[in-house]
Amino acid sequence: MQNSHSGVNQLGGVFVNGRPLPDSTRQKIVELAHSGARPCDISRILQVSNGCVSKILGRYYETGSIRPRAIGGSKPRVATPEVVSKIAQYKRECPSIFAWEIRDRLLSEGVCTNDNIPSVSSINRVLRNLASEKQQMGADGMYDKLRMLNGQTGTWGTRPGWYPGTSVPGQPAQDGCPQQEGGGENTNSISSNGEDSDEAQMRLQLKRKLQRNRTSFTQEQIEALEKEFERTHYPDVFARERLAAKIDLPEARIQVWFSNRRAKWRREEKLRNQRRQASNTPSHIPISSSFSTSVYQPIPQPTTPGSMLGRTDTALTNTYSALPPMPSFTMANNLPMQPPVPSQTSSYSCMLPTSPSVNGRSYDTYTPPHMQTHMNSQPMGTSGTTSTGLISPGVSVPVQVPGSEPDMSQYWPRLQ
């Protein structure tokens, strides 16, 4: 085999194109399957494709044979006239029968064996051919009636007295009869040409009508089906047969109805979930309620130095007693909204450490030019440096100045 192989598969095994596996390999596949190996493991061990392993095992489980079937199109025809007639008989007895049920009946009644039983697809093909032949027979009958009517109209036109130049009905018209008959033949030949086009048009209309043949349910049938659907979405075969006997419908139609109804229910459930999610989701992003409302309130001038800080240190008294009165203003247009620091008790609470010792340190603050003359006459502390940060034009905030002691790392930002 290795001398005449024509290819190597994806697993590294050799094969001869168009030829079956040798019997030794087939026997090994069956033995490995009996020992409990999975098809994928057998495929890797023997270097045979997974599809080949599955096909051989499936045929072995079905027929008990590991021999290959016929090669190269020499497979005998399984849809013999006897089998086709049996299939047509089963279909007439039960129009809603499935192909696999026909296959089982062919086996159980001994019409076919496991070797020559037609496949489900072959049975479906036979059923399609039978349906098309039946439609063609019905169409031919309709066309025969149309031809009969057209032929009668052609002979009606040959009656004497209908056209000018014909003889009076009371007189014998032997000379005009051949001409009349010839004229009738001409009209028949002319009408036959139009008849072909009419037949083609009727055939198209009939085909469209047959293609759109759908089952229509009465109100009582729909109510019974909906009631059963409320009870269960997946009725078993006994429930379907009971319902079929109750509302006079084939069981197959009921099965198809339930399948379509489940699909409709899934679509409706999806729309309901989407609406529910849309109603639960707000249409806009709400502003966090953690912002303090005191941001928009004017800051009053403290009456006592250090009263806003809640402290009475002497250093703070000396530092802030020399400052001029600060006008009140609002922060609505000057400060950006920021979440409050967790350690703050309000938006502008004291940022000094809680240690009571200040060590007498004070901080210089930025002074606008128009207030410089007032500030020069007052004593100020000089033990620190400051820098300012602009929030908006005209408003300055002193930025934190690190000190030598860790307890003075923060202080209350005084606004000018």
Swiss-Prot record:
Residues 7-63 are annotated as: PAI subdomain. Residues 281-294 have a biased composition (Low complexity). It is found in: Nucleus. Keywords: Developmental protein, DNA-binding, Homeobox, Nucleus, Paired box, Transcription, Transcription regulation. The keyword Transcription regulation applies. GO terms for cellular component: nucleus. Residues 164-201, 270-309 are annotated as: Disordered. One of its GO terms (molecular function) is DNA-binding transcription factor activity, RNA polymerase II-specific. Residues 4-130, 210-269 bind DNA. Its main location: nucleus. InterPro entries: HD, Homeobox_CS, Homeodomain-like_sf, PAIRED_DNA-bd_dom, Paired_dom, PAX_fam, WH-like_DNA-bd_sf. Residues 82-130 are annotated as: RED subdomain. Transmembrane segments: none annotated. Pfam families: Homeodomain (PF00046), PAX (PF00292). May be a transcription factor with important functions in eye and nasal development. Belongs to the paired homeobox family. PANTHER family: PAIRED BOX PROTEIN PAX-6 (PTHR45636:SF48), PAIRED BOX PROTEIN PAX-6-RELATED-RELATED (PTHR45636). This is Paired box protein Pax-6. It comes from Coturnix japonica (Japanese quail).
